[in-house]
Amino acid sequence: MTKKIKEIDWAKLLKVNRDVFFNLFSLNEEVAVSDEVKIKFYSLKYSGKGSDDLTFINHIYEAAVNYVFDEKDIKELIEDGYEPTDKALSYFGDIDPLTDGRYGELILYLFIEAVLQTPMIVHKISQTYNNNDQVKGSDGLFIGNINGQATLLLGESKMRNNFHVCVGDALESLKRYINNPESIDRELEVAKKHLSQDLKNLDENDLDLIYQSLRTKQIEFQEYNICYPAFLMYKEGKINNIISANKPEIESQVLEFLKSIKKRRSKYINESLPEIKNITLEFFMMPVVDVSSFREKCYTVFHNGKKYEREK
């Protein structure tokens, strides 16, 4: 009997501990707009000093090595006397954090593996296709089972200081793929050449099946549902007002505020969507006090305490 994509043991490829990841948030709630569109809201923990950005950033820092390298790469680096984490961090080069998309892509990876339980099949070091060290195509390619259905996921990430700009930019990127088979075909054509060595942990027959399924003209590709997950970090200005008021129970007040606006935010996203068919959308929404500040902190943690120096 011929094996199906959904019968592959995708869980054995997951690297993100979902329990540890979820524990970083004080808010984890979903707004189901429709069967095709799910919008999930997450909030970091808060105290009188503000949001606990550094705990979250240190977590993504520790996850970087499995994001950038597969197990074979890591093993070879250790054998050659290198520290894999140091090598992984070199991917996050000396680039202005206010414009660098790498941190958002890393967070997207964590959300997709933890929430949707679908592993990344092309590691980041292999996705760097051109001389500018920037990535063409989506911000991540994943495969797994969602609701018992084999699913191919092409992700996007945006971090903006304005909610409406963030949503607009994310949807503009997603439109490259939504109902556009040629874009998916180009993405998979490149991905086939850079598949994670971790896939070799599966059976050999599984590998052949996966490779065939990434050819859009083959019958195996038809087994997939197509999902477009998007991570959106945006500034929610009123959070800072709550913190500045310096009242007790700051975290509960922040949560009350975020819960009060999530339906309005979800409605805006839903009304902004293009017409979709035969696909699903997953939005991971992460409102913060200030996106620019969060980006700067990411750079500092990933560069051993160094702040990014801009030309004056």
Go through each PLM region and give its residues.
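A structured, charge-rich N-terminal accessory region that forms the first stable segment of a protein
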Residues: 2-83
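A short, glycine/Asx- and small/polar-enriched loop/turn
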Residues: 133-137
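A short, highly charged nucleic-acid-interacting micro-segment common to nuclease
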Residues: 88-109
